[in-house]
């Protein structure tokens, strides 16, 4: 957690020192990258959209038809 706080603090200082120019950067810790699954960029947010589309009231038997080894699919 201290790495994240240090990063945020440094970004705030950079913004102040650089006349409020916003800089975007991607930071990934080794521990974080080990737990992430590779995902095709086209489908990055698609899985979460599919979960929201599945009705909460349908039975577990009906959900099984949408499951794959990687995530949910919509037929």
Curated annotation (Swiss-Prot):
It comes from Monkeypox virus. Induction: Expressed in the early phase of the viral replicative cycle. Keywords: Early protein. Belongs to the orthopoxvirus OPG050 family. This is Protein OPG050. The gene is OPG050.
